[in-house]
Amino acid sequence: LCRDLGAGMAISEMIHADQALWHTRKSSNRLDHTDEPGPISMQIAGFDPKMLADAARAHVEHGADIIDINLGCPAKKVLKKAAGSALMRDEALVAEIFRAVVDAVDVPVTVKMRTGWDPNNRNGPTIAQMAESLGLQAVTMHGRTRCDMYRGDAEYDTIKRTRDLIRIPLIANGDIASTAVARQVMQDTGADAVMIGRGTQGDPWLPGIIAAELAGHTRVRPDVATQI
């Protein structure tokens, strides 16, 4: 829906890399990309490099154009599986995962992460450098640590520091709910683009409006009757 309404790109919801969990109607629907506008970017989560590599291959066989690795989810049920943002505490394992997935597929591999595990361990820039050196094609960084969850305001200094260290595309994420904020974040961080997450809930027009206004065009949100 966001793509249809003007977003430049959309990424799937996080899908666990364990293919034994894919045999449900919900999972089957996630693997069906009929009539979806490309590029199709599928986000995978897990902790086992081989399992993630196998999942990446399976998604490509089902039509994925991009594989996105999740290092950002802060949910406890994901952390209990040592996946999502929990991986940021194990840089050696992250490197193994990056290598395995990049070697497994012939499509671009990207990563979504947080700035670090907690405010005293903001190792996002280090992992972003690792991603670039191991062949990933883009980094999306949310401006909070895992321990921050979604509390307080996103901080963009770590994203700016990351921009100074890598040359691959960097996408800033966190609290971007207007064109003014998007423009300021891109200016302050040097990010190549912004990603909008929670801001689209109930407002799928937001990404298209921001994209249009950043390009110097005007796009008006439809009236309430049309939205309903």
Regions flagged by a language model, labelled:
Residues 1-228:
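Flavin-dependent oxidoreductase catalytic cores
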